[in-house]
Amino acid sequence: MQTNKHLHLWFPTMGLHALHQVEESISFWQWYIDFVDKIPSWLQLSRVLESAHLTIAHPEYFIGASIGQLALVAFIAFLCRKSEKATRIALGIYLIGLSFFLVWHILISYFTHSYSPVMVTCLIGVYLIPKWTYQVVKK
């Protein structure tokens, strides 16, 4: 059996996601509530403010959701482990989704003129995700 050359990318990608979730849990939600009035309407995602209030009131929900997200990704990685094509597709979708949220965090910080508490992982992601994407798309 030939080894799947893209399997090694799951761990750093999931590591960045996990680190981002930890960073987000520390104080991002309170920051979002404080600055939501400065975020342009086209950047406001539906139900994020509601989720922010829920997370402040019940942090265990956010912890559960974060663990659930990472468990789902690990399950998908497990299912795709024998197929390089499936791994490339799943990793590509995961990287696109992760990129969307990291760029969204950067944009809302830019438009509020405030440093949100998740910028460290966002900037790391902006550096690493193009490298990982290149490794996924090259043959």
List the predicted regions and their residue ranges.
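N-terminal signal-anchor transmembrane alpha helix
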Residues: T3-W29
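Membrane-interfacial loop-to-transmembrane alpha-helix junctions, especially the N-terminal start
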Residues: H6-W10, A86-Y94
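Aromatic-anchored segments of alpha-helical transmembrane domains
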Residues: H17-V22, I96-I106
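Perimembrane loop-to-helix junctions flanking transmembrane segments
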Residues: D34-A52
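Interfacial helix-start motif at the membrane-water boundary
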Residues: S46-G68
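Core segments of transmembrane alpha-helices
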Residues: E60-A77, F100-F101
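Juxtamembrane "helix-exit" motif on the non-cytosolic side of transmembrane helices
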Residues: F78-K82, V103-T112
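Alpha-helical transmembrane segments of multi-pass integral membrane proteins
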Residues: I106-K139
